Amino acid sequence: RIPTLQEYIQICKKYGKKSVLELKNHFTPENVVRIIDIIKGEGYLDHVIFISFDYENMLTIRRLLPEQPAQFLTKEIDDTLIQNLEQNHLGLDVKHVALTKENIGQLHAHGIEVNCWTVDDPARAEELISWGVDYITSNILEAAVTPAACCRD
């Protein structure tokens, strides 16, 4: 059985986990408000990062919750995207193959948090960590991130 949003948030809360919540489809502002209200009802909004391939969803989140972590999902990075993310105070969640040490540095210089997906190779995870990526999405936590990599200063 697939949990409802409320049940999912309750599970995250029970185990003290950050929720990375993907808005998979385009949502009307009214529907985004309903989603936010469910999360607020559980008292867990401070532990949620919203992500979406739909840029309008991210703009709606930003309008409704100016300080809420929100990351635009994409496969590619270009200068226009960086400008838009910086202007709208959004983070980036990008396919890991698009990342380089240089563009991570460029994104950080513009105040943009960098998340990447999906990294299941330990060597690639270590490389991305050494480059300064902020988050890694993985299917295999134990294989993707070693304690030495995630706990270094």
Regions found by a protein language model. Give the residues of each.
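C-terminal active-site rim and adjoining tail of enzyme catalytic domains
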Residues: 1-2, 71-153
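Metal-dependent phosphodiesterase/phospholipase catalytic core, i.e.
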Residues: 1-76, 88-90, 94-95, 108-110
